[in-house]
Amino acid sequence: MKILLATGNEQKAKELKCILPKNIGNKEIEYLTLGDFPDLRMPEETGKTLEENAILKAREAARQAGIAALADDTGLEVDALNGEPGVRSARYAGEYCDPDENNRKLLDSLDGLFLGQRTARFKTVACLATPEGEYELAEGVLGGLIGFGYRGENGFGYDPLFIVKGKSKTLAELTLDEKNKISHRRKAFEKISKKIK
């Protein structure tokens, strides 16, 4: 069985390959990436919610590839910012900004707040879609706090700022294996993998 991991983020695809099962029952699963489909064009994330974006990406990728596709949308929700950056997490500092610019904007937005006022969560919505347009959704959440600066060398995006609830480390200070055991993405994709037939 072949399933397309519909993400252009190579680090995310690597993470997903570590999380997802290699077999379902007696079926071996081969996970393909967008690199295996050079003509496939992913849609713009025009949804107003994480759910809408995950569905949009998975359904379109499955339709174009002709095989089942897994996609997700992840957002960082910060309580002191009324849930921002949320669905716009990748574009928080602007449409064409890089992760460092997003991180700096987040730190600036929280300037003056104590650590206890910086509660946040990562939320991932995963979608499994068929070429016919049918889909299933699953959600995963990881709670924590936004620190005062960058810590750690691993991960990507907001990982160097996000202190995991119950730990003294940021996601970027964890090894990939440690992160994959607790992450919001793991929780969502473990749930969605139970729906693969």
UniProtKB/Swiss-Prot annotation:
It is an enzyme of class 3 (hydrolase). The active site is at residue 73. Keywords: Hydrolase, Magnesium, Metal-binding, Nucleotide metabolism, Nucleotide-binding. It comes from the Bacteria. Gene3D superfamilies: 3.90.950.10. Mg(2+) binds at residues 44, 73. Its cofactor is Mg(2+). It holds the Pfam family Ham1p_like. Substrate binds at residues 7-12, 74, 156-159, 179, 184-185. GO terms for biological process: nucleotide metabolic process; purine nucleoside triphosphate catabolic process. Its EC number is 3.6.1.66. It catalyses: XTP + H2O = XMP + diphosphate + H(+); dITP + H2O = dIMP + diphosphate + H(+); ITP + H2O = IMP + diphosphate + H(+). GO terms for cellular component: cytosol. The keyword Hydrolase applies. Transmembrane segments: none annotated. One of its GO terms (molecular function) is nucleotide binding. The keyword Magnesium applies. Binds 1 Mg(2+) ion per subunit. Belongs to the HAM1 NTPase family. Pyrophosphatase that catalyzes the hydrolysis of nucleoside triphosphates to their monophosphate derivatives, with a high preference for the non-canonical purine nucleotides XTP (xanthosine triphosphate), dITP (deoxyinosine triphosphate) and ITP. Seems to function as a house-cleaning enzyme that removes non-canonical purine nucleotides from the nucleotide pool, thus preventing their incorporation into DNA/RNA and avoiding chromosomal lesions. Homodimer. PANTHER family: INOSINE TRIPHOSPHATE PYROPHOSPHATASE (PTHR11067:SF9), INOSINE TRIPHOSPHATE PYROPHOSPHATASE/HAM1 PROTEIN (PTHR11067). This is dITP/XTP pyrophosphatase.
